[in-house]
Amino acid sequence: MKDFIKNVGATIVGIFLFGIIIGIFGVMSLVGMVASGQATKNVKENSVLVLKLQGDLQEQAQDDVLGQLTGNTFNSLGMDAISSAIKKAKANKDIKGIYLETGILGADVAQLQELRDQLVDFKKSGKWIVAYSDMYTQGCYYLATAADKVYINPEGSINWHGIGSQPMFVKDLLAKFGVKMQVIKVGKYKSATEMFTEEKMSDANREQTQRYIQSLWDNMCKDVSKSRNISTAKLNDLADNGIFVANGKMLLAEKMVDGVKYADEMKAEVKKLLKLDADEKISQLSIADMATVKEEDTDGDDEIAVYYAYGDIVDSPAAGSLFSNSHAIVGNDVCKDLEELANDDDVKAVVIRINSGGGSAYASEQMWHQIDLLKKKKPVVISMGGMAASGGYYMSCNANYIFAEPTTLTGSIGIFGVIPNFSDLATNKLGLKFDEVKTNRNALFGLQARMMNEEEVTFLQGAITRGYHLFRQRVADGRKMTVDQVEQIAQGHVFTGEDALKIKLVDELGGLDKAVAKAAALAKTKSYYTQGYPAPLDFFDQLLQESTDNGSYLDGKLKTSLGTLYEPMKMVNNITTMDRIQARMPWWLIINN
């Protein structure tokens, strides 16, 4: 029996030690894989950059090393990585052109507009771009029209149908569960709360939504018209008369594409452009490959920091939720990062790239203050992405200079408060009973199993009004306007970048490149390089984060599966924990572009 126990014990110890050894070798292999990915890539002569655009487009690239190893990944692309790849390809003499292949790309119109402008700029080098897809979404077709030639599969389609917004209202749904939202707001156009209190859009919200989606569509049509030599009237006619169900041959007849080909035939087309024989291989470079290609002429003396801030503005990250890993602007984290940049003597100016519809009014004010401190030490320039509205505009308004794309959604200067009331759910649906013991009249303020009384509503209305007045004053000070001037364009009113320029909410139209150039000019430096912040998480940081956050894989899958319903569902999930006072655009802004 002793020998048996000894043998079992020895076997267990042996298995344990073997597991440790395998684990060590596994980690060493992973480190080697990560390190090898950073090696400089040599570009072969006569190469082509392949831009495969499919998935969710984020502002900043983040390699999901663990997801790649486990197979639990969902497609996510970084605007910064794509832009860098295009610039490097333009400058590299061995790269002859770009092959653009699109699928389903989750991107806002401003992001597409910025990428399109970069493709147009790429062609100034004399190099070619060809685009191909089995099925173009409307946004991807808009992007593809920057190419010299646009091709489609014979049975492919282009979803060219115009832009629509479909608000979602959850008042009746919540009522079925015994939940009622108590809402207080300031601003005629502050429509974010309508989803809780109304069954349809208010007249003011319908008017402003119609105005800005029309502006987005007009911008898209104008650019496509110029590239394809099709009048905007004709483009609207095609959208109204079902071109989105046409096949390749019909699209060719309408001059929306230059050719109809299968995927294998496109290889022959690219070989022809590269002047290769039929049996020669195409030297291809991906976006990931370009990250390791040395950029030409980047040995500047001074650093211009580009700080990426995108997602909901929150006081602290939401953990332990299916939605916990959605990217967010965490107020405290941003303040710490900006303080470090302020104290870094190597950094001569800071560009803050913002893509946010807002969120916590408290966090927005803290970031406004930190930008104010940063501005006293070095120039601060804002580059707006698809949205820099409400809280996103709050943190923007104090910069030295503000850039927006024509199709950026901005403004929305207003504040509201939402407190859910679960008393009907608890008492009538679940049979729960509550009693009260308190030291003071308002000791139960904020508890969600009761309605606020009139006095509490008055208190909260006062706090929200003060917050609105502070927001309005911040804009007036930052934009050198009077409070009355700000009030005329506030009240929660949403504007496109094009309109925002006319009313002085922004200084100039343009993308991130223009913002960087302006920051360098304000810092009085001609020899500079850019550095992105916050630094992407390395392998070990991702490993630690994965052990504490449970939602990354499921959140990615939810985002892919829910599509346009993802943001409203995330809001319902987070409503009980978010800050009571919010400066944000509507959660339900579903734009079919």
Task: Give each language-model segment a name.
Residues D3-Q38, N46:
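Hydrophobic alpha-helical transmembrane signal-anchor segments
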Residues T40, L49-P167, D297-L425:
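Cleft-lining beta-strand/loop regions that shape enzyme active-site pockets
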Residues P167, K171-K271, S423-I503, D507-L509, ...:
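Charged, glycine-interspersed solvent-exposed loop segments at helix/strand-loop junctions
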Residues A521-K524, Y529-P534, I591:
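C-terminal recognition in membrane/secretory proteostasis and scaffolding
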